[in-house]
A protein has these predicted regions:
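Binuclear metal-ion centers of metallo-dependent hydrolases, dominated by the metallo-beta-lactamase
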Residues: 165-187
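Conserved alpha-helical substructure of the radical SAM core
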Residues: 1-12, 23-27
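Conserved AdoMet/S-adenosylmethionine-binding subsite of the radical SAM
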Residues: 21-162
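Conserved hydrophobic residues forming the short capping helix/wall of the S-adenosyl-L-methionine
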Residues: 1-2, 36, 176
């Protein structure tokens, strides 16, 4: 790449699956940092994570070494987290997630997907006043360096889910900005 004049600005771990589940995640990040430092020292390293493995110390330490650890916080309600993110562990809950996110001392980016609709006959809407007020309260505790909000971008396995509108996302972003957060919105 370097010989061809192609220089990456970001090396991103994402895709089909959760990158932090890999048993050698910490070593992979260390190797990536070393390779980046050798060949492309100006490139950032980013990991997009659903936040379900933050309780593993190796995962926490590895994410804290990179420039952009982008961690999901889709709801402050346990029942909604189960609907939206479908965590594997029955013990996964908002309170433990909040504690893990706070451990980063602001060295993280929070990413939240807003949506509404129905899953298995139950209403899903993480844009209610209760949800948004709780989300902003959580952001105040977490103190992320940036907040990214977005909505569904492609076909979902559940047809009854709907995108948040541009107006809804803009209103949520404005509330967070009024609290001092750097917010980016993707429609």
């Amino acid at each position: 790449m370097k010989a061809e004049g192609i220089v990456p600005d970001v090396i991103t771990f994402a895709g089909n699956g959760e990158p932090t589940i890999h048993p050698e995640f910490g070593g992979i990040i260390d190797d990536t940092i070393a390779t980046r430092d050798r060949f492309f020292p100006d490139a950032k390293i980013a990991v997009l994570s659903n936040s379900t493995m933050l309780q593993k110390e190796e995962v926490f330490q590895a994410l804290n070494k990179i420039e952009d650890n982008i961690l999901k916080l889709d709801s402050v309600l346990d029942s909604r987290i189960r609907q939206i993110d479908v965590p594997n562990s029955p013990a996964f809950n908002f309170e433990s997630l909040l504690k893990q996110l706070c451990r980063f001392n602001g060295n993280l980016i929070i990413q939240t997907m807003f949506l509404k609709g129905e899953v298995n006959g139950k209403s899903v809407n993480n844009m209610t006043e209760e949800e948004i007020a709780g989300w902003i309260s959580a952001l105040k505790q977490i103190s992320p360096k940036q907040v990214m909000i977005y909505t569904i971008d492609r076909e979902t396995p559940v047809k009854a889910l709907k995108k948040a509108t541009k107006e809804e996302l803009d209103a949520i972003a404005e509330r967070a900005r009024k609290e001092g957060f750097d917010v980016t919105v993707s429609y």
